[in-house]
C-alpha cells in the first residue's frame, strides 16, 4: 500500500513540518499572553515531550528492524544465487552453460534494479526482466527433469526455489513500512509540544534561538527516521555489496 508520505518530496515535507512547528510555537506564545492562566505548564510540557520521545524511540526501533531485515535479505539472496550457480554445474551441457549465463544476467538485473530503487520505472523494468529469467530457468529445468537423476533434480530445484522465494521476500520487505498512522501521531505530538513550549506568560520576548533549536533538532530526528524507513529514497540505503561481490565472482569464474 502506497502511503501519502511517499508521494511528497522529502525537502518539501521537512519545510512544511518546520513551518507548522514555528506556527505552533507562535500560537502558544500568543495564547500565553492573551490567557495566562495555565498552572502546571512545565509538568504538561514534560509529559508531552516524554510521549513524543517514546513515540520516536518506538518508531526508530521499528524502522531499524526493517532496515536490518532488508540488509540481511541482500546477503540471503546473494548466497541463494551462488548456491544455485554451483548446483547447476551438475546439469549436462549445453543446458549448464545456458543456465549459468542466465544466472549471470539475473544477478546483474537484481543488482541494477535495487541500486535504482529511487527510479520506479527503471526498478520495475529490471524486476520484470528478472521475472522473465525466472520463467526461463524453471522451464529449462522442467525440460531437463526426465533426463537427470532424482538427487540432482532435488538439489537444483531446492536451490532455484530459494532464489525465487528470497526475491519475493525482498519485495515484501521493501513495502513493509512504518504505518502512516504512527507518523501522524508523532507529528501531532510534536505540534502539541510546540504549542506548550511556546506558552511562556512570564517571557516578554519570543525565545527565537531556543525555538529554532527545538524545530531544527526535532525535524532532523523525524526525517532521519523517515529516511531510514524508506528504502527507495533518501540517503540511508541498504548496501548491495553482497550482490556486487557475487557479480564479480561469477565474472571471474564463469
Question: What does each of the following model-derived ranges do?
Answer:
Residues 43, 64-68, 72, 124, ...:
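Short, solvent-exposed segments of well-ordered alpha helices
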Residues 84-175:
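Structured inter-helical modules in multipass membrane proteins
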Residues 1-4:
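Hydrophobic alpha-helical segments
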Residues 74-90, 239-254:
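Short extracytoplasmic/periplasmic juxtamembrane "stem" segments immediately C-terminal to an N-terminal membrane anchor
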Residues 37-49:
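Loop-to-helix transition at the N-terminal end of transmembrane alpha-helices
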Residues 55-75, 229:
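Transmembrane signal-anchor/signal-peptide helices with a preference for the extracytoplasmic
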Amino acid at each position: 500500500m502506497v502511503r501519502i508520505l511517499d508521494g511528497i518530496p522529502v525537502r518539501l515535507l521537512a519545510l512544511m513540518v518546520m513551518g507548522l512547528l514555528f506556527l505552533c510555537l507562535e500560537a502558544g506564545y500568543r495564547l500565553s499572553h492573551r490567557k495566562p492562566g495555565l498552572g502546571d505548564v512545565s509538568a504538561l510540557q514534560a509529559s508531552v515531550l516524554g510521549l513524543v520521545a517514546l513515540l520516536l524511540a518506538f518508531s526508530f526501533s521499528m524502522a531499524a528492524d526493517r532496515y536490518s531485515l532488508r540488509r540481511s535479505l541482500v546477503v540471503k539472496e546473494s548466497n541463494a544465487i551462488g548456491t544455485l550457480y554451483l548446483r547447476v554445474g551438475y546439469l549436462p551441457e549445453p543446458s549448464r552453460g545456458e543456465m549459468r549465463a542466465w544466472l549471470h544476467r539475473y544477478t546483474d538485473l537484481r543488482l541494477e534494479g535495487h541500486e535504482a530503487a529511487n527510479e520506479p520505472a527503471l526498478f520495475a523494468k529490471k524486476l520484470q526482466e528478472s521475472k522473465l529469467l525466472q520463467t526461463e530457468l524453471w522451464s529449462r529445468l522442467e525440460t531437463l527433469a526426465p533426463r537427470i537423476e532424482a538427487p540432482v533434480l532435488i538439489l537444483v530445484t531446492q536451490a532455484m526455489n530459494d532464489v525465487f522465494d528470497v526475491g519475493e521476500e525482498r519485495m515484501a520487505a521493501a513495502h513493509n513500512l512504518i504505518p502512516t498512522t504512527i507518523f501522524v501521531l508523532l507529528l501531532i505530538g510534536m505540534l502539541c509540544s510546540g504549542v506548550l513550549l511556546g506558552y511562556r506568560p512570564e517571557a516578554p520576548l519570543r525565545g527565537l534561538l531556543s525555538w529554532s533549536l527545538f524545530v531544527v533538532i526535532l525535524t532532523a530526528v523525524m526525517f532521519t527516521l523517515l529516511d531510514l524507513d524508506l528504502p527507495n529514497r533518501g540517503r540511508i540505503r541498504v548496501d548491495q555489496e553482497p550482490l556486487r561481490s557475487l557479480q564479480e565472482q561469477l565474472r571471474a569464474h564463469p
